[in-house]
Amino acid sequence: MAKDIRECLLEQVGKFHQWQEITYPGKTTEEIGGAWEVDYPAWNDIFDAFCHVLTQMNAEMADSVLLDEMVYLIARDNEAEGFIQETTSHPQWFECLCRRAAASNENEAKWQFAAYLPECSCSQEVRDIILDFAKDPNEYVSRRALLAMPALRPDCVEQFAPLFWERNCYSPELQEYQRIAVLVSLDAIHSDLLPQYLERAKQDGRSYLLEHAKRIEGGLAMNEKLSRPQFNQMDTTEKQTLMESLAARYDMTFLGLHTFDRWGQNCTTGIFKKDGREFVFVPGDTVTLGWE
């Protein structure tokens, strides 16, 4: 049974390889470039066979040939990301394929595993592969790894920040993207290093980097306003405006202000809705969003 499932997928991959060779004779995937894979007419057949392997075959039974071809397919599906999304629902397979991808030359697979590692219930050993992806020489692989690191290894973000900021091995455009990733990841972990990197971004002066720095600074200013003392000093209109800004920042729907008695004092809070669930913002020394 498992052999038939394996052979079915390998047969579909073989057809894809044949199509690739006929359509782009003598060229590697890097030499072809662009989103050439989307022109293949039988992606649905490959996807069905791929999903059948995930659901009907134990990952421990997979040999190197099957694993390599599955990593190859994930890499070729880098535009739609359907294969990697499906794989995240199968942690054993995700772990096997993530390890295989990390040891491969398939950059289009590596960045997807880096990006989707936070979405999968993997072992800590596999989650730590994010550190290897962050050291990858491919710019996009390393950048996606740094952006995912706050969810996986927040304790390591600060040690990678200088590396990403200072290295000059990429084009000026890609270096700017590396520095943007530093700001975003430091902001995600509320790092004490963030202010100095925001200042360095201003000194850098490139437009996209400045844009992200201003956006992050705006968020920091909002967090200051959301502390309880400042919040209490606002009138109702100011509170309403601030809550609407908070909703926009976190892609939520603001349902209105609510005043309640807490320890003998009147407290005002904001009620929000996201993904069909309502929750409350409670101003305090730091921003706290809690499900209700």
Regions found by a protein language model. Give the residues of each.
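Alpha-solenoid helical repeat scaffolds
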Residues: 97, 112-113, 129, 144-145, ...
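Extended repeat-based scaffolds of very large eukaryotic assembly and lipid-transport proteins
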Residues: 1-120, 124
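Extended beta-strand/loop cores of jelly-roll/beta-sandwich
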Residues: 225-292
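Structural detector for tandem alpha-solenoid helical repeats, activating at a conserved register
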Residues: 93, 108, 125, 140, ...
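Residue-level detector of extended alpha-helical repeat arrays and alpha-solenoid scaffolds
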Residues: 77-81, 110, 142, 175, ...
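Short inter-helical turns and helix N-cap capping residues of alpha-solenoid HEAT/ARM repeat scaffolds
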Residues: 105-106, 137-140, 171-175, 205-206
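Amphipathic alpha-helical scaffolding segments comprising HEAT/armadillo-like alpha-solenoid repeats
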Residues: 57-68, 90-103, 122-135, 154-168, ...
